[in-house]
């Protein structure tokens, strides 16, 4: 049934390469479910599928249900992007280049606020931590978090193709392969609200949702859910794009239309969020922003760097009281 | 595609079978077990390879990585390397950046303790046109133990290598494979490495098989790894050979400069003269020795190698001090007067060369070429140093470029560990290439251009060259800039 669904969606996308990739990832996910016990197959079963996964017919679903934070067209868009996502020189190049910086930021911040992290060995700073990556895409950040030793990592994404690609890619790496087998690394196809409704006992030391909230329809509700799954004293990391004139120039005009760094339609300026708004959302959930840091991209050298200017890309760290 | 997957699965099964075989058969060489899987294999324990190993072992973030360093020759101890009072024939000019790197990995003290380190703070460059040439002079050498300000240091290759390798032996996670070379790369396939969890492996000359997440090729200009992987590169052969030897210098009779503090060790000037056949350089060594590197055409090199010691020395002195020949240059003189190319009418004898006492080594030679590899990285493979870029030795920058590679690659590996990346991650290695390739190419092209400029004897080019040199010699900010570059400092800083 899953296979049928994918081939259907691929025909729609008219991308011959994609279908091959997906058959491959499909095949591999089957290998997982058969090689490990029923526990692992749970994650690729329909349990976590949202109502939105049968995408063709019910695109109006999102507007009628109040609990959904995601828009269907966003999910569709990222379903299309998944095949090229893991290509470090492809359409997601800026994101690939950003990843080492944001991982380092997360570790550095956790070192200050989490006693475990400060005592862990340098190369395994996240040992003993439960971490979730909400909107994990194809697992860029999730893989890093898993390699850094987190005892449990959950990668959550509403786009099914992303999850299949993420599982497939993890199998290229022996360490991650082991982590999937012993369930310290899990990929789930789900929205945050579905995840919370089904597993509401999950309490994470760190909740990461990087470059996600600008694709979410109801950011306030999204933050509400993030705060619900984090432990008291735990950390929430958000990175997104500010809603400023400069961000329109650089993230939409520059990145999508002039430099063609990312596909047109990746971002919608009206969905960008000001740090002030995020602060008020966090406040109402008893969370406090402890740090805000700007990130700046140089399209010529393809390198990111930290800055104090929050006008375009920024990262924030919040603590639940 | 499905077939491909099946194939991969089969391969995985095969490994399992191999593993199970281990328990019933005695031939365990081809099996994968924890013992022969390394994080990093460094091929080549020369200057660049052993610095790479030290750099990984000395960094708190990367010291947990399991490293194999493979060196084909026998490794000397530091004591062995200084047992002969006469310096080795292969000497290297290290710039300050490289010295900083040695300090940061804690080997500089070992190297210095051999007392075979010679700083230089003056460079004299001139040619055969009778022109005064160019004189770079940095501040006096101030050595207060920690900070030495010299333009660079001339040290024997084997002293530095043995100091580095003795340091390598102190790291518990670095394993040294001595007198072993790489026999094969075991069907290395880019596609398989990129899209499966299979790690590349090398078979050593003793049939031992090692697997690694990252294989670093630091095995020099004739890299075996590069040949095995059929990595394409471009370059050219200069049709030149460098003739090298060691000299003992006499004591200077410098009466004019009695007040100088370091009268005993006044051997701090590097001389280089561009002859029509190629550059000859005298590199000052510690304890009154010097190294000659004479690049010349193949015939002349052969002739120089066959001469007896005395005639050879005569040739060396001549080549440094002989006045420019005026036989064929009536036109040159006209041009010279017209453009005032040689305002002081110098012959070249004014260049003060220390007296040469005698030859203390055999003469050796090596062919000269320029070579550059387009891809510094393949999946889980990375080339550093001469393996990816080979230059003419006239600027003494080859090893220093390799050391800059080491610095960048170790910081990339450090970042990979910190940000939870596989150390063989393609994007991270690509970043290494992006940082180093422009720098290396810049230097390669500058040196190649210099070579073409100085081996050209046409009046136009000599005129231009000398005009340029006289400009250089008289504009001190520009000269300081060049001194900076030769010290390895970057002129343009973006940040």
Curated annotation (Swiss-Prot), chain A:
Which positions does UniProt annotate for Mg(2+) binding? Answer: 211, 214-215
Q: GO molecular function terms here?
A: 3-demethylubiquinol 3-O-methyltransferase activity; 3-demethylubiquinone 3-O-methyltransferase activity; polyprenyldihydroxybenzoate methyltransferase activity
Q: What's its membrane topology?
A: Peripheral membrane protein
GO BP, one example? ubiquinone biosynthetic process
Q: Which domain of life is it from?
A: Eukaryota
Its UniProt pathway annotation is: Cofactor biosynthesis; ubiquinone biosynthesis
Q: Which GO terms describe its cellular component?
A: extrinsic component of mitochondrial inner membrane; mitochondrial inner membrane; mitochondrion
Give me the residues that bind S-adenosyl-L-methionine, please. 102, 135, 157, 210
Q: What is catalysed by this protein?
A: a 3,4-dihydroxy-5-(all-trans-polyprenyl)benzoate + S-adenosyl-L-methionine = a 4-hydroxy-3-methoxy-5-(all-trans-polyprenyl)benzoate + S-adenosyl-L-homocysteine + H(+); a 3-demethylubiquinone + S-adenosyl-L-methionine = a ubiquinone + S-adenosyl-L-homocysteine; a 3-demethylubiquinol + S-adenosyl-L-methionine = a ubiquinol + S-adenosyl-L-homocysteine + H(+)
Matches recorded under Gene3D superfamilies: Vaccinia Virus protein VP39
Location comes to:
Mitochondrion inner membrane
What's its EC? Answer: 2.1.1.64, 2.1.1.-, 2.1.1.114
Sorted UniProt keywords? Magnesium, Membrane, Metal-binding, Methyltransferase, Mitochondrion, Mitochondrion inner membrane, S-adenosyl-L-methionine, Transferase, Ubiquinone biosynthesis
Which InterPro entries does the entry link to? SAM-dependent_MTases_sf (IPR029063), UbiG_MeTrfase (IPR010233)
Q: Which Pfam families does the entry link to?
A: Methyltransf_23
Chief localization: mitochondrion
Q: Which cofactor does it need?
A: Mg(2+)
Assembly and oligomerization: Component of a multi-subunit COQ enzyme complex.
Remarks, anything else?
This protein may be expected to contain an N-terminal transit peptide but none has been predicted.
**Family assignment from sequence similarity:** Belongs to the class I-like SAM-binding methyltransferase superfamily. UbiG/COQ3 family.
Q: What does this protein do?
A: O-methyltransferase required for two non-consecutive steps during ubiquinone biosynthesis. Catalyzes the 2 O-methylation of 3,4-dihydroxy-5-(all-trans-polyprenyl)benzoic acid into 4-hydroxy-3-methoxy-5-(all-trans-polyprenyl)benzoic acid. Also catalyzes the last step of ubiquinone biosynthesis by mediating methylation of 3-demethylubiquinone into ubiquinone. Also able to mediate the methylation of 3-demethylubiquinol into ubiquinol.
Question: Know the name of this protein?
Answer: Ubiquinone biosynthesis O-methyltransferase, mitochondrial
**Organism whose genome encodes this protein:** Dictyostelium discoideum (Social amoeba)
- Kindly list the organism's lineage: Eukaryota, Amoebozoa, Evosea, Eumycetozoa, Dictyostelia
Curated annotation (Swiss-Prot), chain B:
Q: What else is known?
A: This protein may be expected to contain an N-terminal transit peptide but none has been predicted.
Q: Which pathway is this protein engaged in?
A: Cofactor biosynthesis; ubiquinone biosynthesis
Q: Which cofactor does it need?
A: FAD
Q: How does it assemble?
A: Component of a multi-subunit COQ enzyme complex.
- Chief location category: mitochondrion
Q: What is this protein called?
A: Ubiquinone biosynthesis monooxygenase COQ6, mitochondrial
UniProt entry keywords in alphabetical sequence: FAD, Flavoprotein, Membrane, Mitochondrion, Mitochondrion inner membrane, Monooxygenase, Oxidoreductase, Ubiquinone biosynthesis
Q: Which GO terms describe its molecular function?
A: 2-methoxy-6-polyprenolphenol 4-hydroxylase activity; 4-hydroxy-3-all-trans-polyprenylbenzoate oxygenase activity; FAD binding; oxidoreductase activity; oxidoreductase activity, acting on paired donors, with incorporation or reduction of molecular oxygen, reduced flavin or flavoprotein as one donor, and incorporation of one atom of oxygen
Under which EC number(s) is this enzyme classified?
1.14.15.45, 1.14.15.46
Q: Which GO terms describe its cellular component?
A: extrinsic component of mitochondrial inner membrane; mitochondrion
* BP term (GO), one: ubiquinone biosynthetic process
Stored Pfam families: FAD_binding_3
Protein task: FAD-dependent monooxygenase required for two non-consecutive steps during ubiquinone biosynthesis. Required for the C5-ring hydroxylation during ubiquinone biosynthesis by catalyzing the hydroxylation of 4-hydroxy-3-(all-trans-polyprenyl)benzoic acid to 3,4-dihydroxy-5-(all-trans-polyprenyl)benzoic acid. Also acts downstream of coq4, for the C1-hydroxylation during ubiquinone biosynthesis by catalyzing the hydroxylation of 2-methoxy-6-(all-trans-polyprenyl)phenol to 2-methoxy-6-(all-trans-polyprenyl)benzene-1,4-diol.
Asked if the keyword Iron belongs to this entry, the reply reads no
């Amino acid at each position: 049934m899953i296979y049928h669904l994918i081939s259907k969606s691929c025909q729609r996308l008219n991308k011959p390469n994609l279908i091959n990739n997906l058959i491959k990832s499909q095949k591999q996910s089957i290998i997982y479910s058969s090689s490990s016990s029923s526990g692992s197959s749970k994650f690729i079963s329909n349990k976590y599928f949202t109502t939105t996964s049968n995408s063709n017919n019910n695109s109006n679903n999102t507007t009628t249900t109040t609990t959904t934070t995601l828009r269907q067209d966003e999910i569709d868009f990222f379903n299309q992007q998944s095949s090229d996502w893991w290509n470090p020189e492809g359409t997601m190049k800026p994101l690939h280049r950003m990843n080492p910086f944001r991982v380092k930021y997360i570790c550095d911040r956790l070192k200050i606020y989490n006693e475990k992290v400060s005592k862990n060995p340098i190369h395994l700073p996240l040992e003993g931590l439960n971490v979730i990556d909400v909107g994990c895409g194809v697992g860029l950040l999730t893989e890093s978090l898993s390699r850094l030793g987190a005892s449990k990592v959950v990668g959550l994404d509403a786009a099914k193709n992303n999850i299949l690609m993420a599982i497939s890619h993890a199998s290229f790496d022996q360490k991650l392969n082991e982590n999937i087998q012993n369930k310290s690394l899990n990929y789930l196809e789900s929205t945050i609200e579905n995840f919370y409704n089904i597993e509401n006992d999950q309490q994470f030391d760190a909740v990461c949702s990087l470059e996600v909230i600008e694709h979410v329809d109801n950011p306030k509700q999204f933050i509400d859910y993030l705060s619900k799954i984090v432990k008291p004293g735990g950390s929430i990391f958000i990175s997104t794009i500010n809603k400023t004139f400069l961000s329109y120039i650089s993230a939409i005009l520059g990145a999508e239309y002039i430099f063609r760094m990312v596909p047109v339609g990746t971002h919608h300026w009206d969905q960008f969020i000001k740090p002030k708004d995020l602060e008020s959302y966090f406040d109402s959930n008893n969370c406090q922003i402890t740090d805000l840091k700007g990130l700046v991209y140089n399209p010529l050298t393809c390198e990111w760097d930290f800055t104090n200017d929050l006008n375009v890309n920024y990262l924030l760290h919040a603590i639940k009281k | 595609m499905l077939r491909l997957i099946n194939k991969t699965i089969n391969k995985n099964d095969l490994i399992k079978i191999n593993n199970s075989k281990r328990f019933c058969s005695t031939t365990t060489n081809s099996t994968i077990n924890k013992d022969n899987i390394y994080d990093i294999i460094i091929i080549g324990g020369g200057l660049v390879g052993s610095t790479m190993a030290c750099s990984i072992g000395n960094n708190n973030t990367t010291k947990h990585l399991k490293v194999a360093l493979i060196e084909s020759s026998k490794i000397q101890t530091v004591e062995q390397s200084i047992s002969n009072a006469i310096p080795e024939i292969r000497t290297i000019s290290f710039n300050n950046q490289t010295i900083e790197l040695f300090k940061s990995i804690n080997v500089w003290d070992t190297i210095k303790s051999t007392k075979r380190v010679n700083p230089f703070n003056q460079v004299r460059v001139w040619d055969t046109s009778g022109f005064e040439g160019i004189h770079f002079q940095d501040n006096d050498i101030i050595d207060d133990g920690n900070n030495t300000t010299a333009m660079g240091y001339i040290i024997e290759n084997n002293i530095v290598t043995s100091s580095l390798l003795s340091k390598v032996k102190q790291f518990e996670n670095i394993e040294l494979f001595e007198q072993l070379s790489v026999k094969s790369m075991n069907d290395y396939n880019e596609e398989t490495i990129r899209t499966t969890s299979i790690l590349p492996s090398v078979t050593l000359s003793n049939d031992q098989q090692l697997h690694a997440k990252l294989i670093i090729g630091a095995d020099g200009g004739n890299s075996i790894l590069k040949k095995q992987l059929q990595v394409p590169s471009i370059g050219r052969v200069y049709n030149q050979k460098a003739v090298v030897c060691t000299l003992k210098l006499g004591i200077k009779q410098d009466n004019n400069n009695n007040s100088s503090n370091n009268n005993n060790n006044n051997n701090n000037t590097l001389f280089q003269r561009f002859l029509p056949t190629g550059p000859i350089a005298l590199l000052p060594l510690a304890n009154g020795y010097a190294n000659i590197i004479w690049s010349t055409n193949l015939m002349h090199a052969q002739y120089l190698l066959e001469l007896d010691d005395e005639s050879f020395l005569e040739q060396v002195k001549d080549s440094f001090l002989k006045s420019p020949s005026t036989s064929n240059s009536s036109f040159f003189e006209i041009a010279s007067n017209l453009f005032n190319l040689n305002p002081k009418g110098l012959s070249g004898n004014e260049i003060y060369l220390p007296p040469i006492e005698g030859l203390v080594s055999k003469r050796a030679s090596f062919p000269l070429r320029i070579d550059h590899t387009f891809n510094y990285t393949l999946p889980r493979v990375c080339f550093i140093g001469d393996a990816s870029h080979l230059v003419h030795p006239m600027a003494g920058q080859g090893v220093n470029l390799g050391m800059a590679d080491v610095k960048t690659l170790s910081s990339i590996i450090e970042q990979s560990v910190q940000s939870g990346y596989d150390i063989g991650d393609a994007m991270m290695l690509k970043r290494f290439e992006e940082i180093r390739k422009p720098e290396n190419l810049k230097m390669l092209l500058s040196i190649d251009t210099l070579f073409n400029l100085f081996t050209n004897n046409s009046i136009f080019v000599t005129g231009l060259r000398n005009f340029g040199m006289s400009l250089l010699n008289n504009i001190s900010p520009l000269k300081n800039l060049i001194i900076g570059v030769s010290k390895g400092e970057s002129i343009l800083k973006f940040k």
